[in-house]
């Protein structure tokens, strides 16, 4: 089978088979353009080797709802009760530096073990979801399908005529309310 080769054409001249070239991509029938660079980039990209952004460490804005506490949010002096300017500057510096270094120290000591624990937790969660939850749900849906058909037949056989008859009997009932003074 030539797969759509014209006279004089060789199969080596094409990036993809002539059948796909003439007929289009099998997944998108009328798409004759197959960009192999994009396909290779998508298939070669590995999530374990991607670079992380050290500047924007919350690209999905996961912590936007978390309270961001600055010095001005915690300590404020109302008008007329100001401390010395030097004390105010020293307090600001002490608060900011202490918060900064305590956070860094805590993340250095506890961050890596917690990252390990959360990595294990989400790996287990993914494993359970992929290998237990989804197959159980799919099995349940397959098994319940035959029961739902029997249930549907019973409802249409027994309940539908009963409720249609009740609807016809009670459909003519009219209620009139009047207010007596």
Swiss-Prot record:
It is a peripheral membrane protein. Homooligomer. The keyword Lipoprotein applies. This is Caveolin-1. Keywords: Cell membrane, Golgi apparatus, Lipoprotein, Membrane, Palmitate. A lipid is attached at residues 136, 146, 159 (S-palmitoyl cysteine). The lineage of its organism: Eukaryota, Metazoa, Chordata, Craniata, Vertebrata. Signal peptide: none annotated.
């Amino acid at each position: 089978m030539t797969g759509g080769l014209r006279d004089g054409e060789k199969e080596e001249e094409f990036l993809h088979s002539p059948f796909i070239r003439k007929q289009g991509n099998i997944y998108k029938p009328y798409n004759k353009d197959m960009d192999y660079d994009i396909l290779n980039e998508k298939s070669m990209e590995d999530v374990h080797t991607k670079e992380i952004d050290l500047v924007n460490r919350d690209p999905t804005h996961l912590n936007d709802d978390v309270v961001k506490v600055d010095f001005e949010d915690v300590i404020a002096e109302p008008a007329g009760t100001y401390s010395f300017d030097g004390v105010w500057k020293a307090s600001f510096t002490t608060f900011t530096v202490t918060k900064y270094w305590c956070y860094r120290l805590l993340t250095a000591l506890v961050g890596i073990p917690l990252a390990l624990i959360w990595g294990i937790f989400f790996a287990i969660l993914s494993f359970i979801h992929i290998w237990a939850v989804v197959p159980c749900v799919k099995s349940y849906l397959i098994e319940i399908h035959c029961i739902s058909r029997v249930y549907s037949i019973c409802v249409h056989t027994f309940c539908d005529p009963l409720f249609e008859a009740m609807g016809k009997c009670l459909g003519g009932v009219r209620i009139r309310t009047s207010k007596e003074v």
